[in-house]
């Protein structure tokens, strides 16, 4: 069985590849655990200057493996995937991070891309957060990330509708830094990573820390009530119905409970 998370390092650039193309790189628990370990390892390597995150095949990442998630919930394991912890590790990485987004970046895949410092997309790139269609809520940390990146009104439209945003619209909103032809994506990302890697690492790391600290200061607020609301939605009957409907390929019937 092939490894589902690949890691290579060359010329100071660490490339992390989601390698489950037959499942559109949907993240199962083992992949999330491996991502967490990989990002932790990369953060500790002084010879790494840049981290690139990409997906094998035509899709960046379709989000969490919903079949696995539904099975876990049926077994009473409400939250075992650890994606938020893995993304926190990615965001805390002192090295600049770049997402190479080809095709869909859906739900957890959108989160993964947004937790990278820079995002380069192919002309096939699409971003979507269709969690309301599953009866679940977006993690609070991602809500902040979206508002910081694209503003409150576009965030509300993205979350309320669950509709996908194409590459050019994503560029306009700020979800992407650049859009290139699919055939050029790998070359452009490599060139960008090399430009960053050639700069003074202490300088780049310091400036990344400056930008992140400013964002953290804006987020300092009481959020106990928001965490409680997130748990309420996550554990609701609607959330169970949404996942069941997805698995059974039918339209969900939400009752607001």
What are these regions (language model features)?
Residues 88-202, 235-236, 240, 244, ...:
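Crotonase-fold acyl-CoA enzyme core
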């Amino acid at each position: 069985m092939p490894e589902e998370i690949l890691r290579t390092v060359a010329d100071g650039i660490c490339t992390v590849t989601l390698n489950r193309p037959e499942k559109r790189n949907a993240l199962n628990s083992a992949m999330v655990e491996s991502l967490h370990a990989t990002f932790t390892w990369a953060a500790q390597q002084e010879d790494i200057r840049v981290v690139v995150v990409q997906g094998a095949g035509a899709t960046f990442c379709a989000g969490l493996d919903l079949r696995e998630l539904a099975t876990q919930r049926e077994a009473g394991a409400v939250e075992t995937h650890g994606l938020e912890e893995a993304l926190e590790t990615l965001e805390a990485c002192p090295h600049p991070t770049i997402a190479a987004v080809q095709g869909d970046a859906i739900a957890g895949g959108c989160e993964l891309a947004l937790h990278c410092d820079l995002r380069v997309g192919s002309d096939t790139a699409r971003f979507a957060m269709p969690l309301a269609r599953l009866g679940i809520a977006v993690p609070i940390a991602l809500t902040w990330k979206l508002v910081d990146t694209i503003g409150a009104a576009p965030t509300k439209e993205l979350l309320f509708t669950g509709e996908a945003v194409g590459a050019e619209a994503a560029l306009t909103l700020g979800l992407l830094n650049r859009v290139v032809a699919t055939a050029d994506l790998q070359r452009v990302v490599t060139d960008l990573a090399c430009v960053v890697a050639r700069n003074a690492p202490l300088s780049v790391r310091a400036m990344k820390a400056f930008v992140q600290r400013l964002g953290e200061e804006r987020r300092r607020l009481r959020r106990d009530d928001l965490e409680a609301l997130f748990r309420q939605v996550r554990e609701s009957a609607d959330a169970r119905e949404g996942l069941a409907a997805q698995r059974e390929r039918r339209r969900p019937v939400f009752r607001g409970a």
